[in-house]
Amino acid sequence: MINRITDNKFELISKYEPSGDQPQAIEQLVDNIEGGEKAQILMGATGTGKTYTMSQVIAQVNKPTLVIAHNKTLAGQLYGEFKEFFPNNAVEYFVSYYDYYQPEAYVPSSDTYIEKDSSVNDEIDKLRHSATSALLERNDVIVVASVSCIYGLGSPKEYSDSVVSLRPGLEISRDKLLNDLVDIQFERNDIDFQRGKFRVRGDVVEIFPASRDEHAFRVEFFGDEIDRIREVEALTGRVLGEVDHLAIFPATHFVTNEDHMEVAIAKIQAELEEQLAKFEKEGKLLEAQRLKQRTEYDIEMLREMGYTNGVENYSRHMDGRSEGEPPYTLLDFFPDDFLIMIDESHMTMGQIRGMYNGDRSRKEMLVNYGFRLPSALDNRPLRREEFESHVHQIVYVSATPGDYENEQTDTVIEQIIRPTGLLDPEVEVRPTMGQIDDLLGEINARVEKNERTFITTLTKKMAEDLTDYFKEMGVKVKYMHSDIKTLERTEIIRDLRLGVFDVLVGINLLREGIDVPEVSLVAILDADKEGFLRNERGLIQTIGRAARNSEGHVIMYADTMTQSMQRAIDETARRRAIQMAYNEEHGIVPQTIKKEIRDLISVTKTALPDKEETVEIESLNKQERKDMIKKLEGQMQEAAGLLDFELAAQIRDMILEIKAMD
């Protein structure tokens, strides 16, 4: 067991001071948290600096904080921002470590068993270990996570109890230390020295923690006593300094001691006998044979190695949980008084609520056909009410909070003023009769001023027809549809910003990474057709696409005024009035955001010296494509090493596109 440091303070480092209505939002949020309020909503308009406000709140309340985002890309962006704000504190990243994941499944209609197939990202696995170890060692921790944080992880008590604690002067034999390391799933390898491994050279044991990627520790013995412990560069062996205490955390989150393992194996065997009897009674002899063979193999592996592939499916027995009891998750690694912040809560809470059912239906099929014991059903994500039971205090952050958040609390704190003085755009409604020619005139007016236009339609056919028509009219236009790959999508956004074309047509322009300051006009076709993209939240989010330009304007083409349209227009007008009053009072003139146009191709500069080469990938022969993949893979690892996961994901998608050509 390790002692957690509880007196560290968060230290926020920023060249900015809170401005606009940030000071009031920060003060209200902090007062409510310190006053014991369980849930509150930060309703911040696009571009008002919500992440900065969140950072100020974390620094002032000084609580370990879990920030949950609805996808890896957004989690990566937030992680980078929090890292900049808190360079002297533990800012951690916890997302699914699979680059590729095909879950275990069975399709009875075709009698097809799909074995679990996955590719684990070593860098992200390291960061997950770094997150859990930081939570057990200190209190000044921010973990930025995706919804994978509600999936089963392993007992924090077993994880903490298994820590191997070393210090100079400790009486322990070298062989005892080696056994202890093997017990916590470290692997001896005297040649290939990397994370989760150790090597032995006479009286010296070198250990490479699972949460590190560059530094290892050299433990030097004098007889049966530790003489000294030194931190070294894993690659060169260069000594970086001596340490007076070293805590080695397990190399896997699913760890249990020998006594607990024997109890778990006995329970697995008992459950196996029970399930075999059930299958035989039902005449399911094939299922019984399949289950017996698979489970007995896993039991043998657990007995001999303490681990087996798919060990998480036995986590109920290994953790000593009862049937139906929720699994341990990342949330259990936090102390009781931690703070949760849900970013883009209108999206994230929907994911959290929906995870359980999808996982359950897939696993029930595996259990019914003899691929897994029924206890595998308890290796699962948390149900909504189980997640809620972990909540001590929570802040939902969104420009458009969902129904769920509004049901949880009446405390809504608004953040409407942008530091740049930018206003929410003006919104007008025009009839659909003659809408295309009307829109053409508006586009041409924008082109003359070197500004850009977004057009959002409801159907693929309309988007394609509109794009073709505008091209005939001499407009430089592109259509962004769902089939476009990630890298190509980012290139399209870049080209729009550079003025390679002036108009972007799409169906769903709400996805992340689509904010373009040069866009001064957003046209919403079929605005009166109620649905996901034309409800109040969808319309407000779409209107927000024009909120980064001082000339921002939105035109809704519709023949009737729906309630969603009216509410979205009223809310935008309300925010705009508040922003205008603030600007007038403080003499602020709105300024279009000056955002650097990042050279998206530069991520692959060494492999692809110029843009022309990326376009002509099809002309490369098989060997040239193979060489390019090798170079790109090196750059992907480099980007991941620099914690630029968005960049790494873009390069990965390019690699997949090149591989698909063979």
Curated annotation (Swiss-Prot):
Binding site for ATP: G44, A45, T46, G47, T48, G49, K50, T51
One CC-aspect GO term: cytoplasm
Segments carrying motif Beta-hairpin: 97-120
Cited SUPFAM superfamilies: C-terminal UvrC-binding domain of UvrB, P-loop containing nucleoside triphosphate hydrolases
MF term (GO), any: ATP hydrolysis activity
Domain Helicase C-terminal residue range list: 435-601
Domain UVR positions: 626-661
Keywords: ATP-binding, Cytoplasm, DNA damage, DNA excision, DNA repair, Excision nuclease, Helicase, Hydrolase, Nucleotide-binding, SOS response
Intrachain disulfide bonds: none
Residue ranges constituting the Helicase ATP-binding domain according to the UniProt record: 31-188
CDD domains in UniProt: DEXHc_UvrB (cd17916), SF2_C_UvrB (cd18790)
GO biological-process terms attached to the record: nucleotide-excision repair; SOS response
Matching Pfam families: Helicase_C, ResIII, UVR, UvrB, UvrB_inter
Complex formation: Forms a heterotetramer with UvrA during the search for lesions. Interacts with UvrC in an incision complex.
Domain notes: The beta-hairpin motif is involved in DNA binding.
Family, similarity comment: Belongs to the UvrB family.
Protein name: UvrABC system protein B
Organism: Streptococcus gordonii (strain Challis / ATCC 35105 / BCRC 15272 / CH1 / DL1 / V288)
